[in-house]
Amino acid sequence: MVHGIDATQEFYGALFGWEFVPGPQQLGPYVRALLDGKEVAGIGQLPPDRHLPVAWTTYLATNDADETAETIRCCGGTVAVGPIDAAEAGRMAICSDPTGAVFGIWQAELHHGIAAAGPPGTPVWNELLTYEASAVGKFYRTVFGYEAEPVVSPDVDFLTLHVDGRPVASLHGVGTELPRDRGPHWMTYFEVADTDAAARLVTELGGRVLRPPWEGTAGRRTEGRLALVADPEGAVFTIVRSAGG
């Protein structure tokens, strides 16, 4: 959700090569982002009187949004919006886990989510940065039925979440290293062809580079070159050129 949807489209269109088409309008103006005709993201506009921080929202799939919303409440989380129908696309809600990290839930009908992942300009991973991965991991396992694979190390607090044996997201406990102005939050990783060039383009388009390019891993699953950036409205995300990509 953003404040200026037109300017945001210009930024991401220039950065990732996205095109945009109208989407469901239940929560106000909303567009779907397409890359080569395949949906890769969605951008909605906040009401003019809602002066809220702008961020990318990670959506987690469910077969029953209403039942999942109730389970979230019972497990100490919060349901801030919904569940509501998004036209014929599906049913959704905006929620937060017990530590305050915001995420969405999505019950698919006609729209089953991202149609492309891997090529430059597409989201390739989602990671929760939190105080303690093992503690909040119980919440996500209970609510969504994920299998959790921990990293066996006394120095690393990290869980990979799986569905039917397939890795789908990760939880990274960083303790007091969490930014004080953000708290626990989900991070979206977008693939790029050249991390350094993309980081320069971010600044040329009015965004900011919060951490210059470095060699590392995206969610400890794929090595590559990454940079932490923010769009002109302040939404933070990570760009990554995956090794071998």
Q: How does the language model describe each region?
A:
Residues 1-3, 32-33, 48-71, 75-124, 149-166, 173-178, 205-245, ...:
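Vicinal oxygen chelate
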Residues 39, 49, 167-168, 177:
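Active-site/binding-pocket entry motifs
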